[in-house]
């Protein structure tokens, strides 16, 4: 649009309700509001100032119902209770540019798997697999299933079968997931030889637990566009009680972010590496015996 306007000296006018302190709208407000002689004019005003015909009673009722939201919706103030959960620098420093989008399974590595299940409509059904290496938590695989082009749904049973086969390639015979239809998930995954464990933490709590992993620089992510976008758009809200929560914004999604952070939390919660311990403190024969026992457990009928 802007290049075309250069030929006509036309104006580009944008109108919006302010929301979070990020993005193009906030950038224009921050850089140009109240600046004399600027070629960008930013006007800010309440709904009543721009439309005096609005009912005072209706506005007061909305303000009483949700004062925080009303300051944005009716007073045109950027919200102070919502902030970006992760800044761009933290996310960018975690991305391993140049690596394959998916890393193949390797022998001798213990993997964890986390799924964000979906009923096949709206949200994606996602799975993440990762491992610990050199004190860092690596997301090896991140996949999602969406409705096919032109359709509004997909088959969650077929997706579960596909993801269960993927998990087994990484010797993951148990996975962790959120509370979405936990009974259905447990039944569906068990049909394909994988145990589904419901996460003890909520999605928001998982995000908050992962924050120190990002700030310490011990997260390694694939250069996955959907994941990175969802991480950047996660919102951290401070409630009146003082408790923080993290979730996607209005009309947003966080299916890939949920799966990735879920497996990061699973890895950090079980960061004790038995193989490293045996290698450091036991004889080589003990290490080989332990590896054989793990292989036999994976090949047993109970684990297949």
Regions found by a protein language model. Give the residues of each.
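RNase H-like, metal-dependent nuclease domains and their acidic two-metal-ion catalytic environment used
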Residues: 9-41, 52-204, 208, 221-304
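Short, conserved "post-DEAD/DEAH" coupling segment immediately C-terminal to helicase motif II
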Residues: 1-10
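Conserved AAA+ ATPase "SRH/arginine-finger" region at the nucleotide-binding site
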Residues: 44-50
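Substrate-gating cap/lid alpha-helix
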Residues: 210-213
